[in-house]
Amino acid sequence: MKKDIHPEYVECTVTCACGNTFTSKSNKSEIRVDICSECHPFFTGSEKIVDSAGRVDKFKKKYNMK
């Protein structure tokens, strides 16, 4: 590898929206994620409802669509 051309590989803190944190390695010192293994439905066995219909309704209302 050539010297001084690669980004520094440091230990980083990964923070999930659910509040779970863990450490990993990355070029950044801090990473924020929306979902992790502690809150993902596949790992928890529970179902999580995503409110995508609300976004569509908001868009239609904003642009006066029917």
Swiss-Prot record:
Q: What SUPFAM superfamilies does the record point to?
A: L28p-like (SSF143800)
GO-annotated biological processes: translation
According to its UniProt record, what is one Pfam family this protein matches? Answer: Ribosomal_L31
Does the keyword field hold RNA-binding?
A: yes
Q: Write one Gene Ontology MF term.
A: rRNA binding
Superkingdom assignment: Bacteria
Q: Where does Zn(2+) bind?
A: C16, C18, C36, C39
How does the cofactor bind to this protein, according to its record?
A: Binds 1 zinc ion per subunit.
The cofactor(s) it depends on are:
Zn(2+)
Keywords (A to Z) from UniProt:
Metal-binding, Ribonucleoprotein, Ribosomal protein, RNA-binding, rRNA-binding, Zinc
Q: Gene3D superfamilies, per this entry?
A: Ribosomal protein L31
Q: Which terms in the GO cellular component ontology are assigned?
A: ribonucleoprotein complex; ribosome
Say if the entry is tagged with keyword Ribosomal protein. Answer: yes
Role this protein plays: Binds the 23S rRNA.
Q: Which family does it belong to?
A: Belongs to the bacterial ribosomal protein bL31 family. Type A subfamily.
Task: Tell me which HAMAP family the record gives.
Answer: Ribosomal_bL31_1
Tell me how this protein assembles. Part of the 50S ribosomal subunit.
Q: What NCBIfam families has UniProt attached to this entry?
A: L31, PRK00019.1, PRK00528.1
Q: What PANTHER family does this protein map onto?
A: 50S RIBOSOMAL PROTEIN L31, CHLOROPLASTIC (PTHR33280), LARGE RIBOSOMAL SUBUNIT PROTEIN BL31C (PTHR33280:SF1)
Q: What name does the UniProt record give this protein?
A: Large ribosomal subunit protein bL31
